[in-house]
Amino acid sequence: MCGIVGYLGKKDAFPILIKGLRRLEYRGYDSAGVALINDNGDLNVFKTKGKVDNLVEYCSDKNVSGSIGIAHTRWATHGEPSAVNAHPHYSESRNLAIIHNGIIENYADLKVKLQAKGVTFRSETDTEVLVQLVEYVMERKELDLLTAVQVALYQVIGAYAIAIIDKRHPDQIIAARKQSPLVVGIGEDEFFLGSDASPIVEYTDKVVYLEDGNIAVLKRGEDLKVVSILGEEQELVVKKVDINLGQLEKGGFPHFMLKEIFEQPDCLTNCMRGRVNVDTDNVVLSAVIDFKQQLLQAKRFIIVACGTSWHAGLIGKQMIEQLCRIPVEVEYASEFRYRHPVITNEDVVIAISQSGETADTLAAVQLAKDNGAFIYGICNAIGSSIPRATDTGSYIHVGPEIGVASTKAFTGQVTVLTMLALALAKEKGTISNDDYMHIVKELHEIPAKIKEVLKLNDRIADLSRTFTYARNFLYLGRGFSYPVALEGALKLKEISYIHAEGYPAAEMKHGPIALIDSDMPVVVIATHNGMYEKVISNIQEVKARKGKVIAIVSEGDTTISKIADEVIALPDTIECLEPLLATIPLQLLAYHVAVCKGLNVDQPRNLAKSVTVE
């Protein structure tokens, strides 16, 4: 949620920190700040409410010199968005400054104890408690900074990724993580910190992903040192990051979201590369090959996810049940972890997360592991926490997704779930050879068909202007199209701030039909499938109540075009792959409605790209 950046080296830290914050803007934030130690040993902290641009403007006449610093973008959890509550926070003596991502659950108790010792607080945040606690421990027990951080964190309950600097030690940064991501970049005589690798890749491709309970010591002139909270030295695992800087730029598009929508043909080609072989009509997933026994012996699959990933899981459920004949449950990770679920060693739990850092999904994974389940991860961010916590899994390989509203990650997740279902079905013998080859060929053609759908962009932009007046939308679908309706409604809510609901089309008559009138646009996914005639009846019911119908139909459909107000035709494909095509016009519709309303498409209000707290 929040963004952490740090630098220690020989260069001017401020521009590196600001550029790093801009790389992390996609995560969502409401304030920003920076702390630097200059050559005179002064610790300068500057912070503002609002965007990084506000911070840059505020600092234009300030002393921002120094070759060591930390910076932060905050998304409020404790305390309202304000300059006072923004990070970095400094200690009472102003010797220490800290930035933090996460939630300290026992901060109130710690604060009361510190206040009883005479410590004065400036902000309403849980983070300030950390820096005051570190200083209190440091002074009362005459400890060095690293030991003081260890002692302080031992008293903390909750999740955190932190970076702390001390003006009395201008040659080091102490960083630590627990249940919140933190990455250290290793350069030539310099170190970098980031919530993810995006602020780092411009300077080095060598990174260390800190594990839970790790504390990193970044010290000028020395090698990186990582210890546990108890002081035990940890093995350094240095990895190479493969991110193209061009993936972090808009590339001529007005917004990242539109760029990422248009990247989907190439993204899905990358997702299938080396996995779908059209010459041999075969799908090969290394995870299925390496862990065939565990996957085939499973009596049940449980998919855990949040948000858009949960919608992908609903499609995966239908795919796996239909092709593999295995019962599948789809759970919100946030609910799953607290409802005392029955999990056994005969279960396979599939955890889906774009970032690989979603707090609730990570907790659900740990719960499932503790109960003996086999864990399969589906993620985009390589080296993130969920892939490291699972037994096996598949990356979706769609590249960094910067827009807060997920687009290419969703279709990548659905593609991986499709490949998983196909690979398992073939191993289990639950699919005929003809059906298997037919689906593989159709899957291989999906990127080209998405390119055809994207040619409708201008038309969708035009019709979007017609619906910016709407205060409510209804999205309807059946079968594989129902999760697409949910995803379409979510996209509209996220970036246009228009209330929207997704429903199974047949459920419309059980409540939502009471809302339909001439001011209610209704988006219906009505492609040729086994329930086509029934969906036509649902459209007739909407029209009878003067609702405005936007229909997503199969190419060549002449029936629905006679009754719908707007029709968007998709290339033909088989039913189980229709979500990969039908979701594209819904992404474009949401995007263009938001643009027509003049809204910030890439950074919608109150939303964060990576939800790393509960």
Each model region followed by its residue ranges:
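Generic C-terminus detector
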Residues: 548, 561-563, 573-614
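Conserved short alpha-helical segments that host acidic/polar catalytic motifs at enzyme active sites
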Residues: 1-250, 254, 269-300, 338, ...
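Hydrophobic alpha-helical scaffolding
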Residues: 7-10, 100, 120, 138-142, ...
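Glycine-rich phosphate-binding loops that contact phosphosugars or nucleotide phosphates
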Residues: 296-438, 442-445, 527-566, 589, ...
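Active-site phosphate/pyrophosphate-binding segments
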Residues: 264-268, 272-302, 392-521, 594-614
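Glycine-rich oxoanion-binding loops at beta->alpha junctions
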Residues: 67, 71-84, 279-292, 316-352, ...
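Structural motif
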Residues: 68, 96, 300-302, 348, ...
